[in-house]
């Protein structure tokens, strides 16, 4: 009779717990938010946060109408739980142990792992002890008896450790737990429980992985998409077998991972990343106030043609693109033209009207060159002789004839300013603004004024921004102008005049010996030779 009453009592408890679990299972799913992580070209991860139940409901995930067969489910925590992360809010699912052996619910091991920790300590202690085994054996179902205490003790077992022995079903087992319940919570329960099921390798990482989302109390569903062409904006639905469902619209982010910039003369700009479009039309791209004409577009690359320009901070606007952001999640996208590159600077620091030659890339026609003295005085290289995107030649003003005083070693600055908005920008600002460049020029110390004058005549002090070897003085004299050029003109004129006289005499001599036709042919050939050997521009400049 006593056994019958005990069985009836246990039956009522089990039915009550089943009723509560079924009541919880009747709650409809709720999608709170949808996030995504771009790991392309490997995979694209979609994360659904909300309140879901995977047990006894047949949870189904659909994306764009297609069922997702492979997904990961992570159970969240109750917000008011202050204990260890293993404590989860629904330990009642453990009442139906047959459900846990079903392979379909293998993704719910995170909840199974959490339900093992709240189970009372008498179960692990009842196995090694010999005396209390007789009392649990009379209760017949050992798997059901541990589920009875979780319903009544799971809320109260967390604040204090003393109520755990008082909630045991039989008074005979109280002596053993009181002496053994203190050490087991730190030593025995975790190894015995983790070694019990074969699924423990799966739930062990789950309490730590959703730690950031678990703190918000949300359940997590994750699934991956490996083909970028399958990623579109659309509806994601979580549904149960009983017909309850929850849907939310998903819109992926287009991420610009890198930008291949063009030079100052204009060219092709290429955006690389993961791009998702609102429709089938090509995107419309605008950089600053300039339209970048679209050439090609795909889900991994966008190419457009941009006209000439320079500088940084141009806003990028791409229409027909879903949520364009950069790698850091910033939606304010900016573009910079390729920086001007100075390969070499050639000039003479002590000569009047010296020519400064700058060789590099990405120059503008309206670029200016400023030479700055150590005392802060600046001189413009104002007389521009040649200006292209790769070469800039200018003549230094007359007032700038000494960069450093004799017998001292100073470092002067040659600042190449590309499209400068303000010619009075300080050196510190110039170094920080994109599009501005400074070259440090080391000057050699002069021992005497005579040595300094010798340097002026021979051109030994050459400016070289990259520390390369100096150009030969003969080549330098050609660029500097002055007396050296006059000597060169004389050396060219005298041999040329002699050559013309000799050629004329030879022509007259040939005319007297050869026929008139052959003489005319020889005269034409001589005229061709003269036009090749005589530098016409040099002669023209001297005569004028």
Swiss-Prot record:
Compositionally biased intervals (Low complexity): 126-142, 150-165, 189-199
Residues in compartment: Cytoplasmic: 511-544
Signal peptide: 1-19
Chain positions covered by the region annotation Disordered: 84-215, 444-480
Record carries keyword Disulfide bond: no
Protein's membrane topology: Single-pass type I membrane protein
InterPro entries, alphabetized: Dictyostelium_Tiger (IPR052014), Ig_E-set (IPR014756), IPT_dom (IPR002909)
Topological domains, Extracellular: 20-489
Subcellular location field: Membrane
GO biological process: hypotonic response
Name used for this protein in its record: Glycoprotein gp100
């Amino acid at each position: 009779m006593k056994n019958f009453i005990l069985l009836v009592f246990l039956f009522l408890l089990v039915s009550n717990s089943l009723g509560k679990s079924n009541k919880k299972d009747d709650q409809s799913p709720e999608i709170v938010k949808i996030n995504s992580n771009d790991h392309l070209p490997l995979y694209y991860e979609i994360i659904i946060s909300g309140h879901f139940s995977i047990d006894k409901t047949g949870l189904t995930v659909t994306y764009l109408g297609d069922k997702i067969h492979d997904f990961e489910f992570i159970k969240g925590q109750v917000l008011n739980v202050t204990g260890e992360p293993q404590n989860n809010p629904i330990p009642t699912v453990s009442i139906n142990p047959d459900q846990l052996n079903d392979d379909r619910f293998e993704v719910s091991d995170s909840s199974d792992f959490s339900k093992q920790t709240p189970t009372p300590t008498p179960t692990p202690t009842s196995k090694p002890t010999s005396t209390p085994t007789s009392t649990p054996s009379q209760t017949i179902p050992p798997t059901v008896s541990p589920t009875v205490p979780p319903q009544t003790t799971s809320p109260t077992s967390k604040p204090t450790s003393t109520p755990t022995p008082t909630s045991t079903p039989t008074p005979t087992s109280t002596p053993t737990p009181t002496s053994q319940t203190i050490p087991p919570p730190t030593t025995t329960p975790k190894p015995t429980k983790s070694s019990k099921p074969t699924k423990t390798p799966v739930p062990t990482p789950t309490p730590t992985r959703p730690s950031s989302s678990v703190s918000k109390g949300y359940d997590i569903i994750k699934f991956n998409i490996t083909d970028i062409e399958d990623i579109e904006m659309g509806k994601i639905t979580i549904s149960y077998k009983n017909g309850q469902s929850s849907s939310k619209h998903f819109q992926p982010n287009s991420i610009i991972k890198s930008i291949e910039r063009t030079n100052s003369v204009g060219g092709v700009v290429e955006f690389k990343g993961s791009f998702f479009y609102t429709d089938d039309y090509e995107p419309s791209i605008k950089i600053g106030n300039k339209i970048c004409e679209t050439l090609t577009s795909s889900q991994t690359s966008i190419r457009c043609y941009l006209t000439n320009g320079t500088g940084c901070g141009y806003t990028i606007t791409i229409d027909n693109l879903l949520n364009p952001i950069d790698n850091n999640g910033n939606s304010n996208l900016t573009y910079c033209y390729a920086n001007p590159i100075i390969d070499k600077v050639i000039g003479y620091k002590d000569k009047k009207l010296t020519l400064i030659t700058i060789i590099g890339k990405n120059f503008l026609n309206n670029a200016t060159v400023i030479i700055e003295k150590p005392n802060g005085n600046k001189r413009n290289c104002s007389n521009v002789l040649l200006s292209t995107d790769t070469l800039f030649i200018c003549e230094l003003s007359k007032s700038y004839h000494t960069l450093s005083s004799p017998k001292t070693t100073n470092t002067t600055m040659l600042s190449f300013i590309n499209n400068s908005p303000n010619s009075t920008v300080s050196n510190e600002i110039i170094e920080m603004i994109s599009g501005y460049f400074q070259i440090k020029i080391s000057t050699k110390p002069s021992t005497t004024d005579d040595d300094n004058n010798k340097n002026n005549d021979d051109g030994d002090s050459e400016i070289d921004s990259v520390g390369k070897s100096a150009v030969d003085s003969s080549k330098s004299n050609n660029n500097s102008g002055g007396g050296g050029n006059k000597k060169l003109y004389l050396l060219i004129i005298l041999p040329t005049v002699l050559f013309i006289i000799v050629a004329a005499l030879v022509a007259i001599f040939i005319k007297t010996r050869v026929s008139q036709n052959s003489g005319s042919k020889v005269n034409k050939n001589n005229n061709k030779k003269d036009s090749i050997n005589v530098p016409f521009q040099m002669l023209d400049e001297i005569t004028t």
